[in-house]
Design a protein with these regions (language model features):
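C-terminal transmembrane helical hairpin of 12-TM major facilitator-type secondary transporters
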Residues: 280-324
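Conserved MFS/SLC helix-loop-helix module at the cytosolic interface between two early adjacent transmembrane helices
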Residues: 71-107
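Cytoplasmic helix-loop-helix junction between adjacent transmembrane helices
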Residues: 109, 115-154
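Helix-to-loop junctions at the C-terminal end of transmembrane segments
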Residues: 72-85, 266-278, 363
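C-terminal membrane-cytosol helix-exit motif in multi-pass small-molecule transporters
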Residues: 182-202, 385-389
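Helix-breaking motifs and short loop linkers at transmembrane-helix boundaries and internal kinks
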Residues: 52, 84, 105-111, 299-301
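Paired small-residue
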Residues: 95, 99-102, 110-119, 304-312
């Protein structure tokens, strides 16, 4: 397994092997960011008494992180786009290390919340960089696979990292869990400096204004698909527990385990297909999501149908972000990918917020049975845009 990296600021030759060590370092950065964001959600009963607040206010630690990431992605990316890329990446990782260390030792909820805001800002910066960084490390015909490797860190964090972190905190304490997460970020700094190549920032004369990047051919379509897919997905995923109970299946943990395991398979399949069959694979994934929502709406009361549908949902959704992200980098070009991805990060977080709100309104107004019917038209819009916008989602990679 080669770990060869290209020289600083140069594109690798087409025959060069994948820089596995560098790509895995970026994937671990994605893993660390997701685990930092979501770990408090599994630790509500443990953190609340130690910080002297309710469990709901511990939940706000996740909300605050997400809002900071949403707010910081575009302005921080615009501010830092002229700097060399690797120091910015290292700075974001050091921010994770410091903020998680503060959470580990803090006895003040206000200080903990402030540390979470800092972590969210670092997360917004990191997400804007990762896909473009991966794309610059490999030849054009391998971009999709490189991005899939990096974004696999998200899937592994959701499927394995958060449950494992929650279990670890139950054994060694939540403060130790955050301390270990801080240590992981420090180790990752060394890994990045050792194996991830450096790239220059944008020169002043080469910088394209944000509005022009947003208007590049294909970008609006990619952002639209991101928004509608995330809203539809979150309508169901946020309220999967009440929906499973509505369907007469009380084992929510099993439902989430099936979904998480299927996402790992989905991203592996995507890594194989993305560079050769981007558009057909994305159309198939979105069509499968739509069929799953229809099946959940019609026959979720049958346990076998519920679990099979959830597995197919995870299979389809697991690879969709990689496919969409690859299309975004193709549309923007690797040199402008950080700016384009900052836009997508904002849209992504907006989709999560709107989807959670929409699902909550549907649940309160019509009950859990309405959730798949609410999600279905949103996923269908994403499918329709992908089908029509052939320029944004080409059948084969450019």
């Amino acid at each position: 397994m080669s770990t060869t990296c290209p020289a600083k600021g140069t594109a690798p030759p087409a025959s060069a092997p994948l820089p596995w060590s560098g790509l895995l370092a970026l994937s671990t950065a994605a893993f660390t960011a997701v685990l930092t964001e979501l770990l408090p959600a599994g630790l509500l009963p443990r953190m609340a008494p130690d910080l002297g607040v309710t469990e709901a206010r511990i939940g706000f630690l996740v909300t605050g992180y997400a809002l900071a990431s949403f707010a910081a992605a575009i302005p921080l990316t615009a501010l830092l786009r002229g700097l060399p890329r690797r120091p910015v990446l290292v700075g974001a990782l050091l921010g994770f290390a410091v903020s998680n260390a503060v959470v580990a030792v803090s006895s003040s909820y206000a200080l903990t919340f402030g540390a979470r805001l800092v972590a969210g800002g670092m997360g917004g910066t990191l997400w804007a960089m990762l896909a473009g960084y991966a794309a610059r490390m490999v030849p054009a015909e391998r971009r999709g696979r490189a991005i899939a490797i990096v974004l696999a860190g998200i899937t592994l964090a959701l499927a394995l990292g958060v449950p494992a972190g929650t279990a670890l905190a139950g054994t060694v304490g939540w403060r130790t869990a955050f301390g270990l997460l801080s240590g992981l970020a420090v180790l990752l700094v060394g890994w990045v400096r050792w194996r991830v190549p450096g790239f220059p920032g944008e020169t002043p004369h080469a910088r394209v204004p944000l509005a022009r990047v947003a208007a590049l051919p294909g970008i609006p379509a990619v952002l639209s698909v991101t928004l509608f897919l995330l809203v539809g997905h979150q309508v169901m995923y946020t309220y999967v527990a009440p929906f499973a109970a509505h369907a007469g299946f009380g084992r929510t943990g099993l439902v989430l385990l099936v979904f998480g395991a299927a996402t790992v398979v989905g991203i592996w399949i995507t890594g194989v297909l993305v560079d050769r069959r981007l558009r057909p694979t994305l159309v198939g994934a979105l069509a499968l999501c739509a069929v799953v929502m229809l099946a959940l709406g019609l026959a979720a009361g049958v346990p076998g149908v519920l679990l099979i549908s959830v597995a197919l949902w995870g299979l389809a959704f697991g690879g969709a972000p990689t496919l969409i992200q690859t299309a975004l980098v193709d549309a923007s070009g690797p040199e402008r990918a950080d700016v384009a991805t900052s836009l997508q990060t904002t849209v992504y977080n907006a989709g999560i917020a709107v989807g959670s709100l929409t699902g909550g309104l549907a649940l309160d107004g019509w009950g859990a049975g309405a959730l798949p019917w609410t999600a279905l038209p949103l996923v269908a819009v994403a499918l329709g845009v992908t089908t029509v916008a052939r320029n944004a989602f080409p059948a084969t990679r450019r």
